Curated annotation (Swiss-Prot):
Keywords: ATP-binding, Glycolysis, Kinase, Nucleotide-binding, Transferase. Residues 105-237 are annotated as: Hexokinase small subdomain. Substrate binds at S185, Y186, T202, K203, N238, D239, N266, E297, D331. Residues 238-481 are annotated as: Hexokinase large subdomain. This is Hexokinase. D-glucose 6-phosphate binds at D116, L117, G118, G119, T120, S185, D239, T263, D446, G447, S448, S483. It comes from the Eukaryota. ATP binds at residues 116-121, 263, 336-337, 373-377, 448-452. Optimum pH is 8.4. The lineage of its organism: Eukaryota, Metazoa, Ecdysozoa, Nematoda, Chromadorea. SUPFAM superfamilies: Actin-like ATPase domain. It holds the Pfam family Hexokinase_1.
Amino acid sequence: MLGLLTITSVFRNWRNSLQRKEDYDECHMRGINNENEISGKSEKNFKLDEPPISLETVMAEFKLSNETLRRMMAHMSRNMDKGLEGGPENSTISMLPSFVPELPNGTEEGRFIAMDLGGTNLRVMLMDIKPGEELKTEQFNTRIPNWAMRGTGEQLFDYITKCLAEFLIEKGIENDGLPVGFTFSYPCDQKSLRSATLLRWTKGFETTGVVGEDVVELLEQSIARRGDIKVEVVALINDTVGTMVAAAHESGGECHIGVIIATGTNASYMEDTSKIKYGLSKAIAAYNYPEMIIDTEWGGFGDRSEADYILTQYDKIVDSRSEHPGVNTFDKLVGGKCMGEVVRVVLEKLTRARVLFNGKGSDALFQQDSFPTKYISEILRDESGSYVHTRDILGELGIDHYSFSDMLLLREVCVVVSRRSANLGAAAIACVLNRVRKQNMVVGIDGSTYKYHPFFDFWVHDKLKELVDPGLKFKLLQTADGSGKGAALITAIVARLKKRNLKQQQQQQQQQQQHVTMVEQNVVEQIAETKGSREQFMNGNQKINLVTNDIPIYDSFNGDIENGVIHLSTDH
């Protein structure tokens, strides 16, 4: 296909250069200086001063060598180290603590509530977990209304609590005091498993009075205002952490990285506690576990221009027109939120250069955000020679003047842009795998872009094999509903750890009691033996010292106690 496209592109470049020369000559013949009047064509169709562009030049910009990808991996790894040391002030990869100390081990059981606020949707779920069985789930879905997304924090959390209460009341469990796990998929500075301060809103939220506040406290205050439900919020997690935990549950307890590739991208992995300087410096309670899941927040990589060498001119155009220019750079490169718009900008450039559609675009094609990312998946699903979806999409864009080679070129643009995203995502995953460095590593992946793009998973796996260090083995596990299942499973892990810690405390108390009893018996025996042999002592002021730790004072012997030492007198 690429050979045909190359031939087609060369022919078009030659033909279009002749056409541009004819138009230019016509312009001078008529004495017209206004480009918009050339041959009756509007400015949106082409400009004489456009730099040369072809499919080859586009592909050259989006093609990243493994050398470039490894350079990016090295920069990411250094930023991860800086994030562990100093957090978001020190690095564009924040490396935020989750305070989740373990993965599920298969013994979790109980009934739990999970809430998932991600994007513009809210889900409330009731999950029954039993060892060795599939999770049983009942759920309620709703869309967050625009007034809540752009209103006050009190309005937003009151709406969330309203949905929770209605679900619990419908199930008749509003007074059962069930534990709640809350998946809150926005960057938070976490201070414990149930305390997290929102750093910034993403995904279209502009709710006031939440940034800088403790999200769990806001939810609990809203629950208290209602007063008609009884629950306990025990964990607040990120969707990436939930994906990692859900993947571990599916794979029998093993998952080394959790990855989201949806509208944006993020990852989590298990890190040694000794390396988590920033996260533990703000902890509100002692953390007594050897490991912790880290929420990398790698979507911000590049926000300080440290990754400019992987940006194309099209990425820069899309970023400059975005809602938050210069923010979440890696999100925009890998996730689906901007992928369609990048393709559209490329198509617009090719059209204006008369490489595509004979230079005749449409108002829709030249309108920002008119080419959603789902178009890419639909175009690439077309079977060879059919192009049913491609024709439908061109119709939706108001383009009816296209050739077979136009459809081939459109498809190839979708390939080069989305494959670049897959390669960057693979490089980021490989960076973490090379840091974790364990055998037979499991990567749990969730997200709409990864799931619904027909080739994305294959491209990620293919590139990973080239970038992961030799000798390291890995497996990709596509995980369904990590944000929902993960929240319930983490709540179950908390319950399991609570039981385990209580049991350990009881065992320690029993061991201490047994030790005390043994010491007491030894002292009593020594006292009895000493009293029975007092006549053997010739010197009335001789004393026997028995070291007694943690034993009560006895009144049944003759002697003194000083600094924990019993002095038994031999006086008659």
